[in-house]
């Protein structure tokens, strides 16, 4: 499995919820249709004006094939969230080598 990790520093805290709603309603359905897509996690630090998005992909080829879609979604998020232009998003790619979840209680 492979992952694209994008951190969004410098977000306008008051615009984060609207940005998440737009992502969920308009961009997530397209993401879910992308070949090799396996999931997404989004974390938010509202007071700090930061967010992180992690998308998971079946293969490295699927990850790279989704680059154009990811670029489009990232640009939309930057516009909607009012990102500080001096603190643009940072994107990295990883091969996932370990996954461990706690046992159900």
Question: How should these model regions be labeled?
Answer:
Residues 1-52, 58-72, 79-105:
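Short S/T/G/P-rich N-terminal loop/turn motif that feeds into the first structured element of a domain
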